Swiss-Prot record:
Belongs to the metallo-dependent hydrolases superfamily. DHOase family. Class II DHOase subfamily. One of its GO terms (cellular component) is cytosol. Zn(2+) 1 binds at residues 13, 15, 98, 246. This is Dihydroorotase. Its cofactor is Zn(2+). PROSITE patterns: DIHYDROOROTASE_1 (PS00482), DIHYDROOROTASE_2 (PS00483). GO terms for molecular function: dihydroorotase activity; zinc ion binding. SUPFAM superfamilies: Metallo-dependent hydrolases. The active site is at residue 246. The gene is pyrC.
Length: 342
């Protein structure tokens, strides 16, 4: 039987939601992750230090794992102050601020419409060593949804990188060859997370033979040439790329609807799904760096010191999983996952 022991991984982009669903989402992500960076797009958004610390307390109240710890982020708005950034940084629990272009994804209506309005805040973040996380899509109606990421790179991200050369930036959940190339060619302060579902699937999986709503996420799945570029980047050993699931649960009826929500749930099997990708590429030896080393190294945090063991043993993912009083349909529902964490 094939086994693989790696340093305990971290998830550098995770949605846990809030309220009664935390019992389920914290359990799923806390099974084998050491840390997870929790996204702040609640309703209302997590815009202050007090809100972030309160959210952290609610997560910890449901955390049954001695090895799992949430790291928090602030939701960046045009009203965010430099004082708030400094206060957040001083807590030791809030490690980043998240830039959502207004309307780009779930609960992003409070996001930034004019990037220049937050330049003073980016300057403070650069000075304080607070990381900037970016949902890299434009949201103007004249840009096709499949082109939003590429346009963002050219019109928004490139100027930010140029104007703030010391600001550490993570381009979240990249979906295009353009984004992978941008990160590779940028300086050492620019990195990216990549999801398991963007490595395993492309837009054909979502659209051919009937619409599959559980593959619908933002940024949207792209064509297979972009998928292959992401796989190459993730499995290459390049330290600029690391694991961020963007596991984003919605209740089954909110996905299977005339106007369904964006987000795919992978927390039930995240490292197992990544292992499939790396095995398929013959690069299992690079999984540990992607999952366990590159993220903490970029964040200037210590690597985890304990390990987990994966076994090449197929199991069937559940058709549905508990999500508070509702159910969530996970990726690979009712289908085989090739690896299992022992």
């Amino acid at each position: 039987m094939t086994t693989l022991t790696i340093t305990r991984p971290d998830d550098w982009h995770l949605h846990l939601r809030d309220g009664d669903v935390l019992t389920d989402t914290v359990r799923d992500s806390g099974r084998y992750n050491g840390r997870a960076l929790i996204m702040p797009n609640l309703v209302p958004p997590v815009t202050t230090t007090e809100q972030a610390l309160s959210y952290r307390e609610r997560i910890q109240a449901e955390n049954k794992s001695d090895s799992f710890a949430p790291l928090m982020s602030l939701y960046l708005t045009e009203k965010t102050t430099s004082e708030e950034i400094r206060k957040a940084k001083a807590t030791g629990h809030i490690v980043a601020a998240k830039l959502y272009p207004a309307g780009a994804t779930t609960n992003s209506d409070s996001g930034v419409s004019d990037i220049k309005k937050v330049y003073p805040i980016l300057k403070t973040m650069q000075e304080e060593g607070m990381l900037l996380l970016i949902h890299g899509e434009v949201t103007t109606h004249d840009v096709d949804i499949f082109d939003r990421e590429k346009t963002f790179l050219d019109t928004v991200l490139a100027p930010i990188v140029n104007d703030f050369p010391e600001l550490k930036i993570v381009l979240e959940h990249i979906t295009t060859k353009d984004a992978a190339d941008f990160v590779k060619n940028a300086g050492p302060n620019v990195a990216a997370t990549i999801t398991a579902h963007h490595l395993l699937f492309n837009r054909n999986h979502m659209l051919v033979g009937g619409i599959k709503p559980h593959f619908y996420c933002l940024p949207i799945l792209k064509r297979n040439t972009h998928q292959q570029a992401l796989v190459e980047a993730a499995t290459s050993g390049n330290p600029k790329f690391f694991l961020g699931t963007d596991s984003a649960p919605h209740a089954k009826d909110k996905k299977e609807a005339a106007c369904g929500c964006a987000g795919s749930y992978t927390a039930h099997a995240s490292i197992e799904l990544y292992a499939e990708v790396f095995e398929n590429e013959g690069k299992l030896e690079n999984l540990e760096a992607f999952a366990s080393f590159n993220g903490p190294d970029f964040y200037n945090l210590p690597r985890n010191t304990d390990t987990i063991t994966l076994v090449k043993e197929a199991w069937i993912a559940p058709e549905t999983m508990a999500f508070g009083n509702d159910f969530v349909v996970p990726i690979r529902a009712g289908e085989a996952v090739e690896w299992l964490v022992k």
